[in-house]
């Protein structure tokens, strides 16, 4: 190896072959010996990196370092140590890095491939969430777990893949959205001021469309005339919150139909009473507890809920008010939440906007809206590969200690580090995946689509600023690396002492055993 690095062997080789160095192309997997030394001898040289080198960020990609930036307060070595996470990295490396020419760049984690984002980052988190749910249901004695649309579609499939004979829980999937639960969310007049909407993007027209379930059955022209006569331009957004609140008071006094509201409430109640029987629990992404409080109000039962995380204040207040237990995967809200998390994990099916009675049965009514093909392709590809990771992990490690270790809450959280790293520190090259992807929230955004790429960038900047203001330096996404094969003897010794003392002791014992003097 030393002779190779000094280029002498390359010169001797070309001399014996009787060829000019510039006519030789040397290909190898070591950047210094196979490329730098060969070039010093005048040869052309190309690097064909080993799959493990590509995955572990040796000149190629940030993929293996995802999650490092979420580790404020403890060391990378401790957090990334669980065997299950290292096995997950092995699966990802085997799947995507068996070709040295696979596109990978130092400023990217996934080379803007949704398959890589889904398989590694989303897949590890999906596996951890599914194992957490199964463990919680087993411990809590839950026999029926209902996944609320659209957040629970993918996770339900993962739970079904991992469920064993020891897991007696049955699963179901039902629609639940702020839009279809508005009759319950607005059951009390005091709740009207706390509607989960972004009032600044609403107009009187959009507001009446949102509240159509309890608006007087009158022609739109008549509703418009009354609104404008009261000083509310039909298509002008509310400039101040006081104007929004004034319009709600006007609506309550002039345009509200209590009978239609009660009919919508009764239909929703009949549907959820059937779908959420005694002993059932729900899964929802989170966060405030409003939807769960509405479900408890409709069913007249305290229905437990499992969240990825809660927002703290509102969820605690509503949990106490409606007496429903809240169990969270994360003990505290993570730095990045909301739109991007839901986009990666939720189904892109049409949202439920209400319920209607058909032949003595209550059935959900879905929005009639066009589908964004770019968003559909991205979410479908990401979720397909995430579920494939869960399937591969189960097929490879079922019945082993690796799978059993996932019952530990600490290992479950560690498995989610790549996902949190992707949310919080998505490299710019990979953020191009989100270009032209709208995030649509019919209630919050008033049917206006939020730009997902901009939203993620803004949330990431806010998270970094919050960490800075709290006095915690945001850890970089690329940590200090130590590659013994590419380091001199003195630096290698120092590196082992700093980063891997156990390996240093083993090497020292081996060296002394070979040469005791």
PLM ranges: what are they?
Residues 51-129:
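Flexible inter-domain linker/hinge segments
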């Amino acid at each position: 190896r030393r002779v190779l690095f000094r280029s002498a062997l390359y010169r001797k080789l070309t001399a014996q072959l009787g060829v000019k160095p510039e006519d030789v192309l040397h290909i190898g997997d070591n950047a210094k010996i196979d490329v730098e030394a060969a070039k010093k001898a005048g040869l052309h040289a190309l690097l064909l990196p080993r799959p493990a080198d590509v995955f572990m960020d040796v000149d190629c990609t940030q993929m293996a370092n995802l999650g490092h930036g979420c580790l404020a307060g403890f060391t990378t070595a401790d957090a990334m140590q669980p065997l299950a996470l290292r096995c997950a990295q092995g699966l990802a490396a085997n799947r995507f890095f068996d070709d040295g020419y696979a596109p990978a760049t130092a400023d990217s984690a996934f080379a803007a491939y949704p398959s890589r984002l889904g398989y590694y980052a989303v897949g590890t988190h999906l596996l951890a969430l599914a194992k957490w749910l199964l463990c919680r249901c087993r411990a809590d004695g839950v026999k029926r777990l209902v996944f609320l649309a659209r957040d629970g579609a993918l996770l339900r499939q993962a739970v079904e893949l991992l469920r064993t004979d020891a897991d007696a829980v049955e699963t179901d999937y039902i629609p639940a959205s702020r839009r279809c639960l508005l009759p319950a969310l607005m059951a009390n007049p005091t709740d009207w001021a706390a509607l989960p909407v972004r009032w600044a993007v609403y107009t009187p027209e959009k507001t009446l469309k949102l509240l159509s379930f309890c608006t007087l059955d009158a022609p739109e022209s008549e509703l418009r005339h009354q609104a404008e006569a009261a000083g509310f331009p039909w298509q002008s957004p509310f400039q101040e919150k006081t104007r929004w609140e004034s319009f709600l008071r006007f609506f309550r006094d002039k345009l509200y139909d209590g009978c239609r509201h009660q009919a919508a409430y009764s239909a929703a109640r009949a549907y959820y009473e059937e779908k959420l029987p005694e002993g059932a629990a729900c899964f929802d992404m989170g966060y405030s507890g409003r939807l769960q409080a509405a479900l408890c109000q409709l069913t007249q039962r305290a229905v437990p809920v499992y969240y990825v995380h809660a927002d703290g204040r509102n969820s605690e207040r509503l949990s106490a008010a409606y007496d429903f237990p809240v169990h969270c995967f994360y003990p505290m809200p993570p730095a990045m939440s909301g739109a991007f998390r839901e986009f990666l994990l939720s189904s892109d099916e049409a949202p439920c906007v209400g319920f209607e009675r058909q032949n003595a049965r209550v059935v959900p009514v879905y929005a009639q809206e066009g589908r964004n093909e770019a968003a559909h392709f991205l979410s479908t590809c990401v979720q397909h590969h995430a579920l494939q990771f869960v399937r591969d992990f189960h097929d490879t490690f079922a019945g082993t200690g690796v799978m059993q270790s996932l019952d530990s809450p600490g290992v479950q959280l560690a498995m989610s580090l790549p996902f949190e790293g992707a949310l919080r520190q998505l490299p710019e090259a990979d953020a191009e995946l989100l270009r032209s992807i709208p995030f649509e929230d019919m209630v919050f955004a008033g049917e206006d689509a939020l730009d997902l790429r901009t939203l993620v960038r803004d949330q990431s900047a806010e998270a970094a600023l919050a960490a800075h203001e709290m006095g915690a330096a945001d850890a970089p996404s690329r940590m200090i690396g130590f590659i013994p094969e590419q380091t001199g003897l003195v630096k290698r010794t120092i590196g082992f002492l700093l980063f891997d003392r156990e390996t240093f002791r083993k090497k020292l014992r081996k060296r002394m055993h070979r040469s005791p003097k």
